Every structure is written in structure tokens, then in C-alpha cells.
Amino acid sequence: MCDPDRPWTRREFLKLAGQAGLLSTVPTLASASAALNPDTVCISILHTTDLHGHILPTSDYDGNRDRGGLARCATQIRRWQRENPNSILIDVGDVYQGTDVSLRNKGALMIDLLNQLEYDAWVVGNHEFDWGMECFERALEQSNMPVLAANTLMEGKPAGEFPDAKHPFAKIQSFILKEIAGIKLAIIGVTTPGMPFWLWPEFTRGLDFRNPVEPVRRAIASAKKGGANAIVLTGHMGLKTRTGGDDFANTVMALTSEFPEVAVFIAGHTHQDVPSRLTNGVLFTQADHFGIHVGRVDLLFDRNSKKLLRRDAMCELMDKHFAFDGAVISRAKSQLAESEEALASPIGELAETLRSRSEPGRPSNLEKLIGAAIMETLSERNVPVDGVMHGSFGDTAELVAGPKSVRDVWNVIPFENYIVTAQLSPEEIKISMDEVFATHENRNLLGFAVKTEGRGGKGKIVSMTLANGEPLDRNKKYVIALNSFDARSGGHHFMKLRVFLERPEAHCTLHPVQTRDALIGYFQRHKVVRRIAAIRPLASAA
């Protein structure tokens, strides 16, 4: 048997593909080898991840426009399926949250498109729960294909063992076993175990997300018992951007180290383009986000022995060279038009451009605006607060002066985070904000006058008063508003804050209003919005 990971030279590849007459159509050596040798079979696994409701093109993180979207991915997926009918199609999670068109139908359009494209499975992602359990359960019910999350307990039952076959949870499985051209291929799916550090508990009611190592061990045993000739692991998790290692939400290194027999790990969650690399001897690949890349894995097997001979992976950039799939556009056309009209709706005017760059203790003008909108929205609901902790989602975000539309607010606040209030002492507020400043996360405290010393992760609060200069009473509690994501630790960043909020005396409360809607409403009420000099508290201390 040939080494499945031996690097081939360009000359060897061109020679082999040329002999097969497939230079213009076959992307990998495994495909070329199968075309040339009838004693081998190539199975292709086509994959998308982190689509986040994007049907049409968007911009990438470098500002390049006209990239991605499921409509383009579908064009390439169909092309690859024509090239190799021995194909499996999967999505690795975060399917529907992220666009207005998807929010309007609570993800139903995206699941419908997965059904129409005949995906074989999709993996549960963390953003599947941003709109609550009812939306997630409807997505399960609507799916024609299994949904994978081997490391999830549903009311205490492992994936694939939920007793009520009519309940949506019964759709969640540990793996699928597909027989193609005589080869049995198991695809095991896991989700990130980091859910509790992002999501309000009510949004994942009845579900428990475990470290995936032992669930994967059980799934591999079951798959092998079912006759699997090869194991593919796919997970809504990736490698950490800076270190390439694991953390509370990503366990790729642990899984590939524990299960080196896995043929390939198809990743997601971290929004990275990783065409092909070896991780602990396991082929690793990840197809970016928003459909900006679509991925393909080719596994070459010997037909008789059913042994894996070679494995290749690649990702294709979905730019202007790829047309939109007609069926996808036709099916989504009316809802896309409805969304476009809503996004273009005017909400008011901004008198001057507001930028997001800030320093610890020195909130940006954009942060001040968001804080004022949250504070005023809560006041209208008879929930006065003393301050707001919030950020502006990056240093480059800005609101440009002029007429504003709903789309402008979406660009500033892309997530459906709810508003949370809690009662904290001055000491708890100081400890929490010192922790926030140490993380390099863009957050500030609005409604208070905060003085700091040091820069970056070394910034510390040296004094804090109310915005009018009045000193804080250490024996009183102050009502602070923040978003639901930060209230759960902001992705493991604000663990001290989380501990304070979980104490009964904090009276931590989730309010049924989202931060984006608060900012839209602020524009609609004020008509012309001007730069905010300072935010004044709308409450007395508790």
C-alpha cells in the first residue's frame, strides 16, 4: 500500500493527471489515481462551514468584497458532484445565524436550502442557539438529514438514544455510516463544548455539551462494529489562531492525539481557511466562513481490500469567477428581496461620523452611542440603570455621518445579543472591569467616570465615580447593563464577572430586547443623532 501522506511533486501529479486526461477537471491526486486505476475508488467529502445565513456574497476579514455565499458554493458543489458521483456533502455548523434574511424566517430558509442541495448531514454549531431552543428544535424538525453532535446529552440521553422518536432531539446522532461503491465510511460529528460560556442557560435548555473525547471513542467503536472501513471526524471547532492549540471550546489537538487512526478532521467554528495540513498525523482541513471557501476531501481506497491508500484536501475560493446556483437563487429570491427592502429602511440621521477605537477607561464615541441606546431603551421599559458595559466589535467599526438605515446598524452590531442587568458593588465593578481591560477585549464602562493607569493588558482602574463626579458608595449596589454574551463570560474571557453575576444577590435578569434593536430604536426616536459627550445614569444606586 502506498503512503497516504507521501508528498507528490508537481511533475508526478501532472504526469498522472495527464495520463488520466483529467487535468482540467480533477483537483487532487486521489481523484486522478481513481480515474486511472479501476481497482481503486475515490470518495469525496464536500463541506461548508460557518455559513451564518449567507446566501449571497459578502466581504472577508481583509475587506475584499464579493466573496462567498451558499449560492456560489452550490455551483462548485454540483460541479464536484458531477466529477465524482461518489460524494458526501456535509456542513460543519453555524448554519443560519448572521443575516437579516435568515433571522426573518428563524433559519428556515437555510435549512430548506440544505435540504434542496441534499446535504447528508450538518453539525450543531454554537450560534444555532442564539435565537433559543424553539428555533433550534424547528431546524431539527425541518432537516431531511441527520444532525450530528456526538458529545451532546439531551435530557440526559446521549446522541442517537433519545427515547421519543417523534421529538426533534431524536434527529441528533453521533455519526452517519454511508456505504459508497462498496466502501463504508463513518462520519462522526461533534460540537464545541464551549456553549455555557457564550449562551444564556435558557437558550440550550435540556442540552448538555461534554468534552468530546469519550463520546468520540464510543462513536468510533459503534462505527467499527457497523463495518466502517474508515473514520472521518468533523467538528464545530478548530485550532486556536495564535497557538494552533486547544482551549475551552476547541479540542482538535486532544481528539487527533487520542484517535490517530481517524482519516481526516473537517473543522469549523474559528473562521479559518486551512486547505490541508497534518495534525498529530491526521489530515486537517477547514473551509473558512460565510461560504468564502468551500472544501473537498478525497479519500482513495483499494476496492478489494478496502484499505485507505491516499487522502487529499483542498479549499476553493468562492469569488466572482463562480456564478450563482440558479436553483438556490430561485428558491430564496422572494425572501432575499424582502430582506433587502427591510435593511434599506431609513431610521434617522447621524450628524457626525462615530468611530470605534477606544482605550481602557476612554470609551469611543460609538461605544457611548451604544451605551446611551441601551440605557434609554431600558428606561422606557421602567428598568433604570446606573451604567452600561459594552464594546463596539472591533477597532475599525464606524458609523459614517449621514442618513442611516437598518443595514448600518447590522454592520455595527452583527449578533443577536439580549440585554442583561445586574446589581454589583463598586468593588465588584472594579474587579470586573480590571479583568475586562486585561483581556484586550474592546469593552468599556459607560455612565461612570473611570481613570486608569497602564496600557493594554496592564491597564488598571485607579479611580471610579459616577459620571457627575459623585463618589461611589461602597455599601450600595449599582445596576449595570451588559449583553447576554458578556454576561456568560464573553467566551471564557470574563470569568470573574460571570461569578459575580451568578450570585443570587446580583439579581441578574435577561430582558427580551436585543442590543441591535435598542440602537435602531434610539435612531428612530431621536431622528438626528449627535455625538454623545457623556452618559448620565438613569437610576439611583440599589
Identify the function of each model-found stretch.
Residues 39-63, 68-78, 82, 198, ...:
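Catalytic centers of hydrolytic enzymes
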Residues 2-321, 365-376, 388, 423-424, ...:
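Acidic, metal/ion-coordinating pockets
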